[in-house]
Amino acid sequence: MGIKHLYQVISENAPDAIKTGEIKNHFGRKVAIDASMSIYSFLIAVRSEGQQLMSESGETTSHLMGMFYRTLRMVDNGIKPLYVFDGAPPKLKSGELAKRVARKAEATEAHEEAKETGTAEDIEKFSRRTVRVTREHNAECKKLLELMGIPFINAPTEAEAQCAVLARAGKVYAAASEDMDTLCFESPILLRHLTFSEQRKEPIQEIHLDRALEGLDMDRAQFIDLCILLGCDYLEPIPKVGATTALSLIKEHKSLEKVLEFMKNDPKKKFVVPEDWPYEDARELFTNPDVRPADHPECDFKWEAPNVEGLIEFLVGDKGFNEDRVRNGAARLSKHLKTAQQSRLEGFFKPVARTEDEKASLKRKHDEKLQQQKKKKKEDAKAKKEAKAKPRGAA
C-alpha cells in the first residue's frame, strides 16, 4: 500500500521535487528495484482475457513474462537493474497483512460469483483483487534473474528499506518502487513506473527527497510523522484525517505527539484515534529499519553474461515460452549490459546547489500557482452553486 496521498501532497506542495521523463534518460544508471512490488504488478498487468498467463501444465507464468521482458526493456535503455526481495515482514505489519489476506479471500468469493452472474468487467476487477505473490513466484523469479545474469539480493525485512540503504551509499542511483514509503526509509531518489510496460506510455517519475523536504518545509522526523498520519502499512488510519488535514496538523503542531495531544483535548472531538495505535513503533521502523549496511558481503552484486541454454531449458522447456524470442532476449542482454558500462557525463561534474535567491524565487512562483489554483477552485464552486440555484428553464 505505501503511504496514502503522499504523492499528491508532494506534487501540490513541493512540485520541484518531482521530475518526469522517458526511460532512456536513465541510461548508464544502476537502480535497486523493489522485487516483490514488481512481481505483484506483473501478476496483475500481464494477462490475457482477464486471466493470468499459464503454461500448458496450468502453471502461472505472468510473473516470469513480466520479469523477463520488463527487465529487458530496462537493459535495452542502458539501465543496470538490481532486484531486492522482501524478507520477513516486521511484526507491526502483521495486522495490515492479515487484512490483505481477508480482502483477497472476499475477492476470491466475489470473483467466483462474478463468473456465474457478473459482467466481464466484474470478473476482471475481482480477479485482480485475488492476486498474491507466493514463495514459488519469488523463487522462480530469482532463478530467472540468475539465468539472465541480473543480480538480486535478499533484504532482512522490507525491500524498500534495503534499496534506500544502497541508494544513500551511492551503490545505486535510486530506489525503484511504486510504494511511496521508500522515501520514509530515506532513499535520496525514488523512481516510479520504471517496471511498467511500454504500452502504458507512463513517464518515469523521479522524486527527490531533499527537495520534497525543502518544499514542505520539514525535517525528516516531521516528514515521517506526516507519513504515519497520512496512513501507512503499519497502522490503521485515523478517521477524518485526509491529505490536507494531515499536512496542516503537522505544520501547526510539528510532531505526532503534539498532534495527538491536540486531538485528545479538542472540545469538538472531531478525531478518534484508534485504541491500539503504536505510532512510536511505526516511527522506529522507518527511522531504524532492519537492513544490512551497504558494505555487507550480501550487498555485493555484479552483472554477468546470460546463461542462454539455461534460459531456453527453463523458459521454453519448462514454461512454454517462444524459443526465438527467448534467444533474441538473451542476445539483447549480452549486448546492452556491455554498453551500459559507459559512464554518464554527469558523473564527471558536481551539481551546483541552488542559491537562496533561486530557492526563494521558486517558492514564490509555487505559492502564486497555489493561490491561483485555490482561486479557480472557489470560482468553479461558486459557479456550480449558482447554476444549481437557477430555476429550470431560466436563461
UniProtKB/Swiss-Prot annotation:
Q: What class of enzyme is it?
A: hydrolase
Q: Which residues cross the membrane?
A: none
SUPFAM superfamilies in the record:
5' to 3' exonuclease, C-terminal subdomain, PIN domain-like
Residues annotated for Mg(2+) 2 binding in this entry: 179, 181, 233
A Pfam family in this protein? XPG_N
Q: What is its EC number?
A: 3.1.-.-
**Chief location of this protein within or outside the cell:** nucleus
Positions annotated to bind Mg(2+) 1: 34, 86, 158, 160
Region of interest called Disordered, as start-end residue ranges on this chain: 345-395
Family assignment?
Belongs to the XPG/RAD2 endonuclease family. FEN1 subfamily.
Describe the protein's quaternary organization and the partners it interacts with.
Interacts with PCNA. Three molecules of fen1 bind to one PCNA trimer with each molecule binding to one PCNA monomer. PCNA stimulates the nuclease activity without altering cleavage specificity.
Q: Name one GO biological process term.
A: DNA replication, removal of RNA primer
> Binding of DNA: at which residues?
47, 70, 158, 231, 233
Q: Which SMART domains match?
A: HhH2 (SM00279), XPGI (SM00484), XPGN (SM00485)
Return the annotated region ranges for I-domain.
Answer: 122-253
Q: Which residue intervals are annotated with compositional bias (Basic and acidic residues) in the record? A: 353-371, 378-389
Instruction: Please state what the protein is called.
Output: Flap endonuclease 1
CDD domains recorded for this chain?
A: H3TH_FEN1-Euk (cd09907), PIN_FEN1 (cd09867)
Q: Where is this region: Interaction with PCNA?
A: 341-349
Q: Which cofactors does the annotated protein need, by name? A: Mg(2+)
Q: Which UniProt keywords apply?
A: DNA damage, DNA repair, DNA replication, Endonuclease, Exonuclease, Hydrolase, Magnesium, Metal-binding, Mitochondrion, Nuclease, Nucleus, Phosphoprotein
- Which cell locations does it reside in? Nucleus, Nucleolus; Nucleus, Nucleoplasm; Mitochondrion
Q: What GO molecular functions are on record for this protein?
A: 5'-3' exonuclease activity; 5'-flap endonuclease activity; DNA binding; magnesium ion binding
Q: Which GO terms describe its cellular component?
A: mitochondrion; nucleolus; nucleoplasm
Q: Which organism is it from?
A: Penicillium rubens (strain ATCC 28089 / DSM 1075 / NRRL 1951 / Wisconsin 54-1255)
Report residue spans for region: N-domain. 1-104
Q: How is the cofactor bound?
A: Binds 2 magnesium ions per subunit. They probably participate in the reaction catalyzed by the enzyme. May bind an additional third magnesium ion after substrate binding.
